Amino acid sequence: RICYNHLGTKPPTTETCQEDSCYKNIWTFDNIIRRGCGCFTPRGDMPGPYCCESDKCNL
């Protein structure tokens, strides 16, 4: 899977991932959008990520 992995509004960059999904999430403590490989369960009051299963789907 190819996922975007840039922070916030930086120019898009990608990485090739072992996982079959990508995620995008806004972290509550700094309001920065993070992107990357896989999908995860948030801790505490952090909102859940947007997860998707196609190449470059997490822009």
Swiss-Prot record:
UniProt key word Disulfide bond: yes
Transmembrane segment boundaries: none
Location relative to the cell: Secreted
Result of altering P47A: No change in ability to inhibit ADP-induced platelet aggregation
Result when mutating P42A: No change in ability to inhibit ADP-induced platelet aggregation
Extent of motif Cell attachment site: 43-45
Cellular component, GO annotation: extracellular region
Phenotype when changing G44Y: This mutation promotes selective inhibition of beta-1 integrin; provokes 1.2-fold loss of ability to inhibit ADP-induced platelet aggregation, 11-fold loss of ability to inhibit A375 cell adhesion to fibrinogen and 75-fold loss of ability to inhibit K562 cell adhesion to fibrinogen
Tissue distribution: Expressed by the venom gland.
Disulfide feature: C3-C22, C17-C37, C39-C51, C52-C57
Keywords annotated in UniProt: Cell adhesion impairing toxin, Disulfide bond, Hemostasis impairing toxin, Platelet aggregation inhibiting toxin, Secreted, Toxin
GO MF term set: toxin activity
Function: Inhibits ADP-induced platelet aggregation and inhibits the binding of purified platelet fibrinogen receptor alpha-IIb/beta-3 (ITGA2B/ITGB3) to immobilized fibrinogen. Has also been described to inhibit cell adhesion to fibrinogen, fibronectin, laminin and collagen.
Family: Belongs to the three-finger toxin family. Short-chain subfamily. Antiplatelet toxin sub-subfamily.
Protein name (record): Dendroaspin
